[in-house]
Amino acid sequence: MAGHLVKYGKHRTRRSYARIKEVLDLPNLIEIQTDSYQWFLDEGLREMFEDIMPIDDFAGKLSLEFVDYQLLEPKYTVEEAREHDANYSAPLHVTLRLTNHETGEIKSQDVFFGDFPLMTEQGTFIINGAERVIVSQLVRSPGVYFNEELDKNGRPSYGTTVIPNRGAWLELETDAKNVSYVRIDRTRKIPLTELVRALGYGSDDDIIDMLGETDSLMLTLEKDVHKNTDDSRVEESLKDIYERLRPGEPKTADSSRSLLTARFFDPKRYDFAPVGRYKVNKKLSMKTRLMDQTLAETLADPDTGEVIAQKDTVIDKNVMAKLSPYLERDDFKTVTYTPSDEAVVTNPMVLQVVKVYSQNDPEKVVNVIGNGNIDLKFKHIVPADIIASINYFFNLQEGLGSTDDIDHLGNRRIRSVGELLQNQFRIGLSRMERVVRERMSIQDAATVTPQQLINIRPVVASIKEFFGSSQLSQFMDQTNPLGELTHKRRLSALGPGGLTRDRAGYEVRDVHYTHYGRMCPIETPEGPNIGLINSLSSYAKVNRSGFIETPYRRVDWTTHKVTDKIDYLAADEEDQFVIAQANSPLNDDGSFVEDTVLARNKEENLETPIENVDYMDVSPKQVVAVATACIPFLENDDSNRALMGANMQRQAVPLLDPHAPLIGTGIEYKAAHDSGIALICRHEGTVEYVDAREVRVRRDDGSLDTYKLMKFRRSNGGKNYNQRPIVKVGDHVDNDEVLADGPAMEGGELALGQNPLVAFMTWNGYNFEDAIIINERLVREDVYTSIHIEEYESEARDTKLGPEEMTREIPNVGEDALKNLDEDGIIRIGAEVKDGDILVGKVTPKGVTELSAEERLLHAIFGEKAREVRDTSLRVPHGGGGIIQDVKIFTRENGDELSPGVNMMVRVYIAQKRKIQVGDKMAGRHGNKGTVSIVVPEEDMPYMPDGTPIDIMLSPMGVPSRMNIGQVLELHLGMAARKLGIHMATPVFDGAQDTDIWEAIREAGVDSDAKSIVYDGRTGEPFDKRVAVGVMHYMKLSHMVDDKIHARSIGPYSLVTQQPLGGKAQFGGQRFGEMEVWALEAYGAAYTLQEILTYKSDDVVGRVKTYEAIVKGEPIPKPGVPESFRVLVKELQALGLDMKVLDSEDKEIELRDMDDDDDEVVNVDALSKFKQQQDEKAADKAAKADAAKPSETTNAQQDNQ
């Protein structure tokens, strides 16, 4: 028997067909969220305060310093925050110290800085009672980038861009004549030498001495002539730059100096961030640039004079190993340049310079200039960076160095929650800083306290704005646990500071070789966001700099054995190594079986001797994301269909009684465990008590832990989230074990669907175009039944005419409609409601008109009751009927926080039990989706030789052209698993081979071709051909026909055109468009067409009269002029065109004006009014009938006596 048994948690054992030993467990799948937020609380916040503070006033008398901060206990627990529509947040208190430099007085004070949202254990935030996720953003890393473009003559031209985290961009480029220019912050271009002069190196000789003689530099110097001899070259360049940046303003050297300092050399305005400084140093460092170059000078030890490398040596790995320690020193091959006193930055500049031969002309000597190992604490750019970048730029023209690929994941980084929050917090703090400065100068220095200086509004506002309305703060996808998990692991290239859909080209969206093990090449949405929204691969982690790293097993260089030592490599580090695939065969001691292996290096796949291999993949599934890793036989599916399969698993609806897949991939347990939906044990112990609401565990030290289960909670997606215990009293449970299944879980594993018996066969054409035929048993036995909970709310507000009132005394409503309401007019829990039923009775005061004498008298006698009220009750919308599951009442008296003007709020939850029905969408895990076309009685379904009816029939046409053969393999292996009564695991890229499948089929006693004779349930005759029948994991998706079906009778109209609105949410009509009109014209159906374009659309007068005529049973009147025609005429008249409408006798037809709207007949609400009058009449009749009944009964009683 192939395969071996593996335990997944305590409740499931599977036969796994994996051949590759797992050397590394999957990491915690939501740590990208939790770790990042923890970093923010521990370090990120402090960093921000230390960046902004101390704040000094303009005169330098006062300074405000940051001492410390602390987060206190949250005001609400997670559950309470959900209940009260509040935020789950904790108050932030900051200790500040105010120093008065004149008197030396120091005041310390604790200042409240607003409530700060906290992350729940599941990696989400609760904002206004709703769970939200902050999606990580994929952005270009700050650094220096070199690119190459071909001009129209086919000659390469190079460009350089220095991109900071915050601040002005610096770009270098050459034109067609090979003259080099610089652009500052996307403005007009300036000759490159002007920037060098502005840095304090004014003469041509200085520049040539520093940068060496290159063609482009000499041409640029010719172009850059000394125009105004009154100024020195440095001052002239400064003024030129100022003129380009601020055209039209008076230019002086001083103003230019301060402008350039502010643009580039002020740490508060220009910031590379540590990651940017690391990238710049790496790109401009001598180590990377000297590799494979030929030295044009002899390099010697500066202390001893010992030769390290002779002239004409080609620098390879071995020479670099000797040279490396010297290049890191501050005194090796360094040249110090002192700028003139007029320069922007007057400090001396230290560069490392080594002479090498040009690649294009081996006789020519070229300077390679490094930026001199700048300390990582310099977050802003320094002149050495600019000079080294210019040198790299010129070296590219000599064939030295390499251009950058901006889609390489070494040049794109992740901004996770912590950093996004930090950036937002910085915005708030810098706005606050301005206010503090102003207040310092206004208030009395002797008496002022930190509390009086600080205004926390901008900080609170910026945080609120980020969580409430940022593109990256998203309403969590809560359809099932996999959807939640994927949402937390999502990477988006959109959002502030990222790309936009329209501008993103093909390259950005494409799969790049560096995605391997970092971002899933399969899971991405279809449509305009394809490739811009990605998912983190299963083993990937994000490092401190924000680059995605993936783990590899180290290969020992001397023995060439694969060790269990794991290294996490970022994309740019990985480029230096040769990496073998995870499925390379190994001996028991870790040595490779074969002498050559398949391996990767950069974008090449090569067959290479094992001596060259540096690393080996950890696992075959490290390439893909969690959702993709849930697809068995992924390797047999076409990638487009696998993409659909991965995306559709997230849309599976949690069923009443789910079952984990018979054929899994072994990741189901980990996915369910880390999603945060299962109930996890925190300390080991023994289960002491279990019921549906709580589990109690007695720890080994004697203390008791109580775990509350989540019962029938409405999720973000309107699904039913419910937990069920899976442990028994007396069980010993370990730390981190699953105590209770969440929605779409079974036995601690993900269970998105069921395992029905599936046949690939046609049946009377009912599975044409991917339609699905299902057995009535699936409906009757609630196999695909799910519970959906919808929330409705009603508020009683104060209006201008008086407060609204919740009551059961509603005008014109019979007693029958009120039977389930309590004395306050609120529906009881457990009542069954249909469309249009009242949930909360509410009346709103109407406008009071002048009362007549009789009405005044009645008013005086009966008090308020005679006042006019309008019925504004909350009713069940179309398709919303079900059973009242819960009612929550919030009032001011109970201390609930309500928005201003609201006196009372009622929330009603309606649960619906939805069975599978015609029109529902279903799918497997291989992108094989379809809608249910017919539900066939069990006795009519085809059946197997043993009498088992088939549950689902799929069209065999759906397989060949789509190339998702994985579903067929799953079907056959599933049949074997069903017969053997076991669960199986076939991990992606390392699963069951065809030999394993055939062996399992033989073992299970299924026919050798894995097909079966199938009999027609209606006639009992066998079908001609043998049919593939087996078990496939099939899901019901959240696109249900109940949510989409919709029919309009009388509904709202658009205000201007008076045509019916569109869409289910607006209770709109179906658009009868241009092409539909052609169809009726082609048939000559003139009257049908006329009524569609008039009564049924926007003939305002006509439709009211028609409604009346139908109600009264009179003939329908002639149609009038459609409103949209009148709108067109009015628009033309507004343009000043004299436009009239004439009839056949050339008489003008009067078009009604908007001012005529007082006329009852043509009012927009006329139909509703008419309907209301009819309803009132009917209600009166009903009331009279009710009144008549009791008197009859009393008469009858008298007769009996």
Curated annotation (Swiss-Prot):
Its EC number is 2.7.7.6. CDD domains: RNA_pol_B_RPB2 (cd00653). It catalyses: RNA(n) + a ribonucleoside 5'-triphosphate = RNA(n+1) + diphosphate. GO terms for molecular function: DNA binding; DNA-directed RNA polymerase activity; ribonucleoside binding. Residues 1191-1201 have a biased composition (Polar residues). Residues 1172-1189 have a biased composition (Basic and acidic residues). Residues 1165-1201 are annotated as: Disordered. It holds the Pfam family RNA_pol_Rpb2_3. GO terms for biological process: DNA-templated transcription. One of its GO terms (cellular component) is DNA-directed RNA polymerase complex. Keywords: DNA-directed RNA polymerase, Nucleotidyltransferase, Transcription, Transferase. SUPFAM superfamilies: beta and beta-prime subunits of DNA dependent RNA-polymerase. Belongs to the RNA polymerase beta chain family. The RNAP catalytic core consists of 2 alpha, 1 beta, 1 beta' and 1 omega subunit. When a sigma factor is associated with the core the holoenzyme is formed, which can initiate transcription. DNA-dependent RNA polymerase catalyzes the transcription of DNA into RNA using the four ribonucleoside triphosphates as substrates. This is DNA-directed RNA polymerase subunit beta. It comes from Lactiplantibacillus plantarum (strain ATCC BAA-793 / NCIMB 8826 / WCFS1) (Lactobacillus plantarum). The lineage of its organism: Bacteria, Bacillati, Bacillota, Bacilli, Lactobacillales. The gene is rpoB.
